Amino acid sequence: MAAFTPITIAYGDGIGPEIMEAVLYILRKAEARISLETIEVGEKLYKKHYTSGISEESWDVIQRTGIILKAPITTPQSGGYKSLNVTIRKTLQLFANIRPVVSFYPFTRTLHPNLNLTIIRENEEDLYSGVEYRQTHNMYESMKLISHTGCKKIIRYAFEYAIKNNRKKVTCLTKDNIMKFSDGIFHRVFNEIAKEYPQINNEHYIIDIGTAKLATKPEIFDIIVTSNLYGDIISDVAAEISGSVGLAGSANIGQHYAMFEAVHGSAPDIAGKGIANPSGLLNAAIMMLVHIGQGDIASLIENAWKKTIEDGVHTFDIYNEHSSSKKVCTKEFAVEVIKRLGQLPITLPKAAYPLIVKKQESNIDYKIDTREVKKLVGTDIFINMHVFSAHDIADKINKLDIGNFELKTISSKGLKLWPHDSRFEIISDHWCCRFMNKDGTEIKHLDITMLLQSLSKANIDFIKVENLFEFDGVAWYSLAQGE
């Protein structure tokens, strides 16, 4: 008798419980070789003052099983609560988010019948690191964190995925014309790794034009690899133009753990009505079965699901009176899929997953390269001051004893306002004062400490210090507009 794989089940919020019940019903009837352990996460935990939406007991279950099938959850939009999705992905180091998007034309409505692409999204970094601050009465900050090792992991994963799944092209999307360091390193690593895969075509688009092309000509894409925020946005764009966000599932893959979920949210507006489409979570479950080596059950369910779609048995979100034959509720849809277990689709591609899946290389040991010579050459000190002119700030600072430093520039929101007059008056309470060593020698941390003491004695409210570094003689800090 084949061993049963333990799976953690999270019912989620909103429509989550009803679509999870439908999916588990199908899995039981298909005789999936899994054993279930249920955890409570999301809204109920937030209401119990778990700011992360998950308890220690649930973490113990996840650590024991290693695999999660999760329905959508609702994250409160205020009050300091953290996104549970982001927390799980980061805690379990699920660095790769895999979102296949396929058109099921002519059985679902879409303008893009040949749509068939996969979005591979970096899952741990970027603005989704969730590092944010309020610095002044007027200014808020969210940090975009991108690492060299993180870029290498996700980009190599994308090319390996292309090889494994017989894909022909990988497209990289960034905004490195503006964010030259963070998005720039993503693009540079993409170019470097692409050279190792000459059999795979590669290309790059700026995210705005890339998204426009995705919305109008998705057929030109095969695999898209991108960073966290961009990937989140374009995944929903792609799912929507496929015919319904409710059809798409996704996988979150790491070295030791994996989580499978629908792309769509918890849809509280239709919760409890029994009309939600369970297909997204079902497709996520199919991806899970493939991942754990139960390709036979995955194929059985996917073929039955496709036959159900072909037969025009649709939930309300994709129902079309001209092409659908029957409108069904969530539970009825599950029953219709179960009726077709063992049947094959006629028009849509038949699924035939292998029983034993070769695990994609996701445990490469990426070490931090420390060979570049790092030199501290200056510091940006951000201050909170209610003035209308950067000249007032410069006059005050230049009267202080600041040692071997000199004040080079003052800027606000990246616009240089001193030493030269600005064309326009800037209303701000958030100023960046750039200090460099007068003789160009390396700066010590003690020098910066003494500088901060001088500012403090003058009642200048410094709110952040960002040191400026050269690596192998190259300046790795941005210049203000106009500098």
From Swiss-Prot:
The record ties this protein, via Pfam families, to:
Iso_dh (PF00180), Isocitrate_DH_C_bact (PF18324)
Spell out the residues of the site Critical for catalysis: Y128, K175
Annotated residues for binding of NADP(+): T74, H264, G265, S266, A267, P268, D269, I270, N277
- What is this enzyme's catalytic activity, as reactions? D-threo-isocitrate + NADP(+) = 2-oxoglutarate + CO2 + NADPH
Keyword set includes Magnesium: yes
Q: Does the keyword Metal-binding apply?
A: yes
Q: What is this protein called?
A: Isocitrate dehydrogenase [NADP]
Species in which this protein is naturally found = Rickettsia prowazekii (strain Madrid E)
Q: What taxonomic lineage is listed for the species of origin?
A: Bacteria, Pseudomonadati, Pseudomonadota, Alphaproteobacteria, Rickettsiales
